[in-house]
A protein has these predicted regions:
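Enzymes that bind and transform nitrogen-containing heteroaromatic metabolites
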Residues: 1-197
Length: 197
């Protein structure tokens, strides 16, 4: 693939995740049932994700998505946003970072580890932004300061326990609030851009 031409903005690595008010992305026993995903919010997800250049996932996130989305639009009870996203997911190029996954379908490439030089090359290619949707993979990207933007969908709930979105770290990273958008169900998008010296 061709690198981005001079004067063309390099595409970004964007971390997208729903999070509770007290900082959890997952409840006890991997519970995600507390997340409010209205048709309005799902439509918003679809509009933005359709512009992406690729989805970047770890093995667990990829296998979760691959177990549902390839045929989700065949369910007669599926809402219009669900039907739309099934097509987006199938068609979107996907990169799975995994040391153990041997095969992956649905327009998916397997990469064994996060190598900063390879990520820089990926960002320099033309196309839409690259979207990370899993916390473990995001941690590997944070370790190399590779994430350019966060899209946090803050859910109006206190979970009390579960898996925290951000693990303890000795590194301080600063961000600029680029957008705040409330939705009717009480979810708020907070979009932050990484500030680099």
């Amino acid at each position: 693939m061709r690198a981005a031409t001079k004067g063309t903005a390099m595409r970004k690595i964007v971390f997208m995740m729903s999070v509770s008010l007290d900082g959890y992305f997952e409840g006890p026993d991997h519970d995600l049932g507390w997340q409010l995903i209205s048709d309005e919010l799902h439509g918003h997800f679809n509009e933005w994700l359709a512009t992406a250049g690729a989805f970047l996932d770890g093995r667990v996130t990829y296998e979760l998505m691959a177990s549902h989305w390839p045929t989700a639009d065949q369910d007669p009870a599926a809402s219009a946003p669900v039907v739309e996203f099934a097509g987006i997911w199938r068609d979107m190029p996907k990169i799975v970072f995994s040391r153990t996954l041997e095969q992956a379908g649905w327009n998916t490439t397997i990469v064994r580890e996060v190598v900063p030089e390879q990520i820089a090359e990926l960002k320099a290619r033309p196309g839409g932004d690259l979207v990370i949707g899993g916390s473990v993979l995001a941690s590997a990207f944070w370790a190399h300061d590779l994430i350019d933007e966060m899209r946090l969908y803050v859910q109006p709930v206190l979970l009390g326990r579960g898996r925290l979105l951000f693990q303890p770290s000795d590194v301080t990273l600063r961000f600029r609030l680029a957008e705040a958008q409330p939705f009717a169900d009480g979810v708020v998008l907070l979009r932050y851009e990484r500030l680099r010296a």
